[in-house]
């Protein structure tokens, strides 16, 4: 791991809230960044699905490969006391008896991730990242890694770069300790993820700066709206140049380096699946209900001033479909700004149809075309958190998918949002979009994982509590 000088961008002057001001006072940071040294951590790229780097824990350092995860806040590695989990047999394990700087804690801990979990206990020791030595850092020794999630993983553990608000056990995150000990001059870190898995350089994480070699133009910054995750407000999602009609009034989004794909609401992912020909899960119940109630819903949409009440009036709230977020349904009559539907969770599949139908009505489609369109969308309903396959030979005919962030449109081409596994006749193509529905008040929510961050160099600006995106280079 080499260290080289990286520049700090001069950020435009912005009004800083109390949290920003407190951060600057605490770390002695001025409003604008200045040139300084940043610590560069080289990352390895495994099939565009996992990006990991090396750290050392203890004295002398015991080496571990970790995912640097902006979607969580704890550091954990397998423990030498992990006796009964098969996953521990295939990964490096921390031995406290081999470290002269180890301090016992012993407090139990457990973390649940989207696709797996770990449990163990807290310990304290030094953590080495490149040339930076973080002293007296609390971390978790994992003694249980159930299931197969971590068994085949190319990494040993996870180093969280989220906020302390979501830290299990309220442990101080490594990034916070790094700042408190004055190891970096500026409270900012940045990611470049190389999407060419064949190249030797898989990517890089820079603590305390940004690398100008890996982005073009200026970063577009958006404020963090909820500390915990690196969460911000995102605007409309476009398929081609057409709105999906769901996030036009705003959706929450999280920049998450620990998630491989783009995860979003079933409502939009279904529309994307239909547009790119992804093979989703057929829902016969969805199709039969649309055939039965579709025409009546269209008639009510054309006349009803409060479309959010249509589903309950039609007694469709008993339909128990896949989990979804609260819907934002916009009136077709006055095209007023979207309001929260207020529908209970079981009503959401019906509300999803309302959104789809409204989009078609706006495009002056006929009743027959609207019914056929929604019927086809039923066939494309994805499995929650499931992957969808696409035809590798059809990429040239697929549309761009775009996200609106900070008033700017960030495009993804089919070559960028489709993951190709293998070569030649045996190649398989996986859609980079997966369904993940979050209940209010936290939803509707998108997770912009490596598929997005690989195309857009990402700056996590803790001092000003904002996230920045620029075209990667």
From Swiss-Prot:
Active-site residues annotated for this sequence: 69, 256
Keyword Lipid biosynthesis carried by entry: no
Tissue expression remark: Mostly present in the violet parts of styles and corollas of mature flowers.
Entry keyword annotation includes tRNA processing: no
GO BP term, pick one: proteolysis
Stored PANTHER family: ASPARTIC PROTEINASE A1 (PTHR47966:SF76), BETA-SITE APP-CLEAVING ENZYME, ISOFORM A-RELATED (PTHR47966)
Official protein name in the record: Cyprosin
